Amino acid sequence: LEPNRTQPRQSFDDGAMTELADSIAQHGVLQPILVRPLLSGGYQIVAGERRWRASRMAGLTTVPAVIRDLTDSEVMQLALIENLQREDLKPLEEANGYKMLMDNFEFTQEEIAKTVGKSRPAITNALRLLNLPEDMQNMLEHGEMTAGHARTLLSFKNEDQMKAAARRVTMELSLI
């Protein structure tokens, strides 16, 4: 059994994982993970990597699973939908998931919106975050600014103005 290297979620909160592992140790896995068979043998996790990781942390050697034959496009869609419905993806994880659907499977923003149950403007706003300079993406990733603040920064004409505004935002947030 192997994780999906293209799954949208890239970080797993240690505290949340410990809580999930404790719950699984006490109650078991309440919902099976979704996997697909691999041509090379074995299976790939499509949905449920957090449950799988937490099960391993809890000492389980097996996890209930549903097996489905899925295309790469279906895997990406289901992984993104499942993550959006569970513990929130970080804003950049969500944006990168949408970008992968567009780049790898030629989805339009409208098709993504229908697939994940969001409005097209919500998809557009998420994707805009990928236009932030790398240092500001890091600030967003580490919770030093909100996605709303980050989108506001994109309205500045140049990167110097953006960076000055970002410093003000992070100072204000650290005072709260």
Residue ranges of predicted features:
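Short capping/connector residues at structural and topological boundaries
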Residues: 6, 17, 22, 35, ...
